[in-house]
Amino acid sequence: MFHATTILAYKGKNKAVIGGDGQVSFGNTVLKGNAVKIRKIHNGKVLAGFAGSTADAFNLFDMFEKNLEHTKGDLLKAVIEFSKEWRKDKYLRKLEAMMLVLDRDKIFLLSGTGDVVEPEDGKIAAIGSGGNYALSAARALDKFADIDEEELVKESLKIAGEICIYTNTNIKTYVLE
């Protein structure tokens, strides 16, 4: 598990949202509390976030964005092509990062081994050290609360930040409407 962050993605009825906390940890020390680990890519039509090694994640963002451009924004095709590249390349297989990517229609988790996972419910995914806490909170809020999509992500990440020592409550979100 990567002890650096928590990223949560949620695809609701009206909006797709990605959010992340701002903490960067090195061992048991907080190096930075306001890092931004999420992005809007492909002309703002796709949201992406990472957990793990920052340098590795930036390389993965760049590679994924090239695949997205090559597939003319088809997220499913882009993640499949990206996964194939990831698995074939000896250097990439050693990267210590995971990504979440989503658009208004699909959401995917890209693992550090090149696996592509679409969440079972098709709408909520989380990665990072506080990922399971954020995922649990998001599922509960999705099931029982009448709450805006962005607020659901913020509240879920806040709960994760209150529990996980590698996650803080300095939360940044991006929304696709």
Swiss-Prot record:
It is found in: Cytoplasm. HAMAP family: HslV (MF_00248). It catalyses: ATP-dependent cleavage of peptide bonds with broad specificity. GO terms for biological process: proteolysis involved in protein catabolic process. A double ring-shaped homohexamer of HslV is capped on each side by a ring-shaped HslU homohexamer. The assembly of the HslU/HslV complex is dependent on binding of ATP. CDD domains: protease_HslV. Na(+) binds at G161, C164, T167. InterPro entries: ATP-dep_Prtase_HsIV_su, Ntn_hydrolases_N, Proteasome_sua/b, Proteasome_suB-type. The gene is hslV. One of its GO terms (cellular component) is HslUV protease complex. Keywords: Allosteric enzyme, Cytoplasm, Hydrolase, Metal-binding, Protease, Sodium, Threonine protease. Belongs to the peptidase T1B family. HslV subfamily. This is ATP-dependent protease subunit HslV.
